[in-house]
Amino acid sequence: PWFISAAVCGQGEPEVPSGVSYPCVAKPVTLSASRGVIRANNDQELVAALSRISKIIESAGPEHPRVVLIEEYIPGMEYVVEGLLDSGNWRTMAIFGKPEPLEGPFFEETIYIAPPGLGFDVEKKILDTVRATCEAYGLEHGPVHAECRINEDGVWLIELAPRTIGGKCSRIFQLGTGQALEDIVILNALGRPAPFRPPAGVIGVMMIPVQGLGIVRRVEGIEAARCVDHIEEIEIDVKPG
C-alpha cells in the first residue's frame, strides 16, 4: 500500500499532497487509541481531516511532531496481535478480533474478542506477517502490539509498535488468566522467566465511544449489567457533570 507523510503547521488551510488517491486514511505519527485517525474519500474530506488532526496534535502537547501519515485505506476485518519477544524468540500472548466493521470516517475502539475464531492457517499468516515486520525493524526484546486487516488479497499490517495494548484492554489478560500483562512484560525485560497461561475460554472487552457533545447527568443500569452472566467488570470513565 502507498503512504505519504505530510507536515501540518496549523496555519491556513492544509494542502493535499501530490500522489494521494482515495479512499485514504490520515493519522498522526504519534498518539494512540485511534485519536486522529480519519478516513477521507476526496480532497475536501482530506483537507478537513488534516485540519482536525492538526488541532488534535496541538492539544496533545509540544512533544508530538506535527506530522501526519496519509496512507491507502485497506478494507477488511481487523485483528490485533499481542506478542512478546525474548532475545528474538516470539511468543504469542493473544490474537483479538474486532467483530464490528471499522470503515470510518472515524475508527473508535469498540469490541475486542479473543480468540477470534480464525482457522489455524489464517492465524499463521497473521503471525508470520507480524514476526517478519519485527525482524525488518530489528525488534528483539519486549512487547509487541500489532494491528492487521484481512481481505481477499491477504493479510495487511496496519500498525506495529514495541508496546503493550493500550487503555484498559490489558485488564482482560488478568481477568482471563489471573496474570497481569504488565508483570509478564517486566519479568521479560529483567531477563527472568515470564510464564504465561493462555486465556481459558473466550475473553473480551467492549468500549462504548461517545457519539457527540454533551454533559453526563447520570448513568443508569450499571448494577443490572453487573448481574449479567460472564460480565466481570464495568468502568465508567466519564463522571457525571
Each model region followed by its residue ranges:
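Acidic, glycine-rich loop-and-beta core segments that form the ion-binding/anion-interacting portion
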Residues: I95-E140, C148
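Glycine-rich active-site loop/lid that clamps phosphate-bearing ligands
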Residues: P209-P240
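Conserved protein kinase catalytic/activation segment
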Residues: G154-W156
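Conserved ATP-binding module of the ATP-grasp superfamily
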Residues: F3, A26, R39-G76, F106-Y112, ...
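Short beta-strand-to-turn element immediately C-terminal to the catalytic PLP-Schiff-base lysine
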Residues: V37-N42, L84-D86, N151, L175
